Amino acid sequence: MERPLLIIQFITGLVLIFGLTSAQERWILSAEEMESIKINGQEVRRLNENVRFVKTDKVILADNAAQYIKDDVLHLNGNTIMINGLDTLTCDSMVYWSKLDSGYAMGNVRYIQPEKDRKLTTDVFHYWQTDGYRGSSFFANGYTRIIETNRLMAANEIKYDDKFQLMILSENASVEDPTRGIFGDEMTIQYADSLLEMIYVNNNAFAYNDLNLKIEKNGSYQKFRDEMTSKEMIAHFQEDYISQLKLMKMATTLYHVVDDSLLAGENTVSGDTIRISFQEGEIKRLQVQGGALGEFNPEGENTRIDTTVFYGGEYIDYHIDEQLSFLSEGAFMEYEGTKLSSGEILVNWETNILDAMLVNEEYPTVQTKGESPMKGESMVFDLVAKHGRIVKGKTSLNQGFYHGKEVFRDDPNIFHVQDSKYTSCDLDNPHFYLGSRKMKMLPGDRVIAKPL
């Protein structure tokens, strides 16, 4: 085995040392003071003041250092700086394994990679060389922040596995862009080369999306924030934009309904699972599964709806651009004291027209507070005008039952019935009845029929 060759030259008190460990690898060292000692039988070179190690495009600076000759391991202390090409790592102290190109940095760690527009700060930073996409894996402990272009990632602990391009953020994890963010106790990030592909949050998930909207057409833009919470969350990305967000277990979301940059209202919805589809950062579709409940609060005169709308169902599907909502399985909608329920409900928010369909014995039903419900096989209802049409309608009044081929409802709570029947028999096909071609019902007052 070739023994290390040491060349020592004293120049105005500065010690220059050239240590050749092999034909391929060498350090060029300099310091104010140097001494060689043995620790546990290993030759160790100690350097003090203005320590400098140089190898090809790597430069390491420190106040003092110890070099373990056989394994080529550097122990660096005080104002430690490693420069590798354009990348710079600074810290209080560091252990560097030269043969492995691996480092363990401690105290006020700051790692800057200008070409990748990336900066990391932490308390403890351990990295090692890999043959993966980024060229190294790492472990960072202490309050850790990573800035990549305009994205900030932070956690008390961050691990990155370059082989699988997988990053794990533990304790107070967060990922934020200028207009959106995701938070949670623990977070897993999947990369596809340089691009963010997926984020999974497995506890106490929270996300937000900032919007600039107007309250008045000629007014100035104001900042609003959509918010989403759940136990677990999965976010998928396409071309650096979030494309889909899935909220699981006790999911809730608050989002703002927008009409051409004008705030139309605020929607709050909850359920077991919520799926939100985005396009370039804007919500395009929202699906709620499992005990879905919602509340829409209109903004001033920006919509024809002038008070809170409550709604729900086992499943809700809201298409934002089309302004359509589909509710199913125990679907209901309540507005200004009138409640409509059905197996399926389709709402057009642009026209405020509701279509309700009979599904699995869940009949379309409309009921005004204090009055008997009216039900039928299908229903069309105008939420604003409170006018509606019910096919094969049925209701009870004054201990009797009224049937009609079609029932038209006017506000306030007036029903016009075509081909009507009145009976005291509660069957859908009564044994006896009084019939009329037209009937007008005023609940709590009287019924007008002509001709009998």
Task: Show the residue positions of the predicted features.
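Structural signature for solvent-exposed beta-strand/loop edge elements and short helix-capping sites
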Residues: Q24-L452
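Bacterial Sec-dependent N-terminal signal peptides
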Residues: M1-W27
